[in-house]
C-alpha cells in the first residue's frame, strides 16, 4: 500500500501545472513586432524575422536583453534551448529574450525547428552568416545587453544549466530571475 501511495504521489507531482513550457511544440512564433527597439541603428545589421514579419536592426534591440545565436544543426544549441525558453517564461517584462537562427539550408528549416522545440520568444534569421561579423563565428553565442543597450557580456559556447543562466543575468544585467 505504501508503495502504491508513493507512486501515486510521484505521478501527481510530476504533472504539476506549475511547470513552465520547456519545449512543447507551439503553433506560431512570437512576432518580431513584439521586440522592443530604440529606433536607432537602422543602418546596422539588418536581419529578417523568422516568422516573415519584416526585418530588424540588431543594434536597435532595447536592453535589457539576452540574444541567443543558434542553428538547428547545432547540438550545443539544442542542449541549452530549454534554458532560454525558461528564461523567457520566467523573466516576464524584466528583459527580452531573442533568438537568431543562422545558416540554415532553408528559412523554413529554422522556422519549423523553432515551432517543434517550443521556442516561444521572437526569432530573427540570418541566411548567410552575416551575424559572424557582429557576434563572432560559430554557435552557440549569447549576448547580454544591459539597460543602456551596451553589450555587457558575450558568452561563446553553451549555457548548459538554468542556474548558470540566472547567474549570468544577475551578474551582467543586474536582474534576479
Model-derived regions, located:
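Extracytoplasmic
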Residues: 40-42, 61-62, 92, 137
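Structural microenvironment flanking redox-active thiols in thiol-disulfide oxidoreductases
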Residues: 78-117, 127-133
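A short beta-strand-turn-helix
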Residues: 44-65
